[in-house]
Amino acid sequence: MKILIKNVDIITCDSDKKIIKNAFLAIENGYIVYIDKNEKADFKPDRIIDGKNKVLMPGLINAHTHCGMTILRNYANDLNLEEWLFDNILPAEEKLLPEDIYWGTLLGISEMIKTGTTAFLDMYLHMDQVAKAVAEAGIRANLSKNPLDFDESGKIVKEDYSFFENWHNRENGRIKTSFEVHSVYLFNEESLIQSAKCAKELNTR
């Protein structure tokens, strides 16, 4: 598939902060093959997009999100963090089913794509459902399973390994997996040690 975007203002985000006005950008099989002020005659596009009065730039990255939480939007507003999280959100999350996370994630992804975000980092519940939504939507993501409840049996550790094996570098590398440190107020020392150990063994983060 060859796509040509013409008459578009390109914000390159390079070290010189260069902006190319009324430019042409050509894409072939998902890769940018040229950017120029002039159209190249030897590029025969299957589709042409007129970018007049539009801006083209690298996609935004959401560096911390819980996409499945989209379905809890506006729940328990106007509270301090401790009351909001421990008294309201965590009890509500205990009732969420895997399919709730799947649909909530798809909703969040659609909103991100609509507003220019093309990659995100996510750590939440039922992460296989999050990964499934990412695979279907075509967005890029770095996903982490929640390791807050490591127990003596190593159950969570095994689940994290399985998640890594099932999803890391899937969808032509669009999906990456890592081991998270969500926050210091939810992690105990053993969780940090086990997360670091897993990441080192799998040569990931």
Regions found by a protein language model. Name each.
Residues 90-125:
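Hydrophobic alpha-helical hairpins/lids featuring a short glycine-rich hinge
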Residues 8, 25, 30, 53, ...:
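Divalent metal-coordination and catalytic microenvironments
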Residues 1-43, 54:
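N-terminal metal-binding scaffold of metallo-dependent hydrolase/deaminase domains
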Residues 130-205:
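Metal-coordinating catalytic core of metallo-dependent amide/deamination hydrolases
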Residues 71-103, 137-145, 155:
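Active-site gating loops and adjacent loop-to-helix segments of metal-dependent hydrolytic enzymes
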Residues 10, 120-127, 185-186:
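Short beta->alpha connector loops
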Residues 22-24, 47, 177:
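Extracytoplasmic/periplasmic beta-strand context in beta-sandwich domains
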